[in-house]
Design a protein with these regions (language model features):
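Conserved active-site and SAM-binding loop architecture
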Residues: 1-345
Length: 345
């Protein structure tokens, strides 16, 4: 078993790094974490009560850390200002500026321990932003390896993320997991959508490959305008029936507000054409499940945990609302496990 002295995890969330270290069978003597979300911290306190909280990442110069012992530092720095789904302000807003804070902290770690390894993560973004982050990371930290990994390789969820490291990372093997593999049985009716809600939805008839529809305005980009199935590598799936009884045809989709010809907006249930879910977000209506051809329901919190390859009930200490949010903000753990195994061969 590999062993490291201490790990520092920035923007810790629900302790994805520590969980991944455990799953990768890498022993760590001490974990420092920075996180200001009280609900995410509640999950950490339940599972890793001995981990050391540091509070606000912007106050890092006040932290009481033995920097010389930090062998690994991770940072999934906030994505809102870099994502195509956001305002794309980059480091021109407060959250985007945390990229520079991240570089300062990692640089400090490397100054005290040049052999330390780092891992930075963020969303798939426009090329200019990706190049900007890569360039300034190299200027600050030295040679950087960058890779884009889709969580669809290790889970039933499409989730493209960039990872920047100071060690080589390969693509994980495709586990071939699809939506039906992670669904809870029997179906809990409390997650069904009401008949009144379903009656308002309009489905697209002919999916175009993996994308079943769009309301994209000219010059606009981003996932919120495109409609994918939650059953393949990002879209509407017909799951293999033998894998899980009862034998439902399962589709994934999302509820989207769409413009009608008269300028009004309707809520439409849009199916994706594959066997993967859409990317988990903090918005519950971004992922729904269709089964028995007539019933529609949301993904359950446990199903969202499975999509993120987190153990069942990992977030059970939270309300369902906070579970959806924390999981949508989190990492796909098996991707991080793969990256750690590349770091500590």
């Amino acid at each position: 078993m590999q062993q490291i002295r201490s790990a520092l995890t920035l923007f810790n969330g629900i302790s994805g790094l520590h969980l991944a270290l455990d799953k990768a069978q890498i022993k760590v003597d001490k974990v420092y974490y920075s996180e200001i979300d009280k609900f995410a911290n509640k999950v950490t306190e339940q599972h890793f009560p001995n981990d050391i909280p540091l509070g606000d990442v912007t106050k890092w110069r006040e932290w009481d850390i033995d920097w010389t012992t930090v062998d690994l530092v991770s940072a999934g720095f906030p994505c809102q200002s870099w994502s195509v789904a956001g305002k794309q302000l980059g480091d021109k807003d407060e959250r985007g500026m945390l990229f520079w804070t991240t570089l300062d902290i990692i640089k400090t770690v490397l100054e005290h321990n040049p052999k330390a390894k780092f891992l930075m993560e963020n969303v798939k973004m426009k090329k200019d932003f990706e190049q900007y982050i890569t360039y300034h990371t190299e200027q600050s930290l030295g040679k950087v390896e960058k890779i884009l990994i889709n969580s669809a390789l290790v889970s039933a969820q499409n989730r493209n993320r960039y990872y920047w490291t100071n060690f080589e990372v390969t693509q994980p093997e495709d586990k071939g997991q699809v939506l039906i593999d992670i669904l809870e049985y029997p179906m809990d009716e409390k997650f069904n959508l009401s008949d009144a809600s379903v009656s308002r939805f309009k489905m697209y008839d002919k999916p175009k490959g993996n994308c079943v529809g769009t309301t994209k305005l000219e010059g606009r980009i981003g996932q919120r305008d495109e409609c994918y199935g939650v059953n393949g590598k990002m879209g509407c799936l017909t799951a293999t029936m033998y894998k899980q009884p009862p034998q439902y045809v399962v589709h994934g989709g999302a509820i989207r507000g769409r413009y009608n010809e008269d300028g009004t907006i309707s809520q439409r249930l849009e199916l994706n054409g594959t066997e993967k879910t859409n990317t988990l977000t903090t918005v519950q209506k971004d992922n729904v499940v269709v089964y028995n051809d007539t019933q529609y329901r949301k993904l359950t919190p446990i199903e969202c945990e499975r999509l993120q390859t987190v153990p069942d009930n990992w977030t059970a200490c939270l309300s369902n609302t906070q579970r959806y949010k924390s999981l949508g903000n989190g990492w796909t753990i098996d991707v991080i496990v793969h990256i750690l195994k590349c770091a500590y061969k």
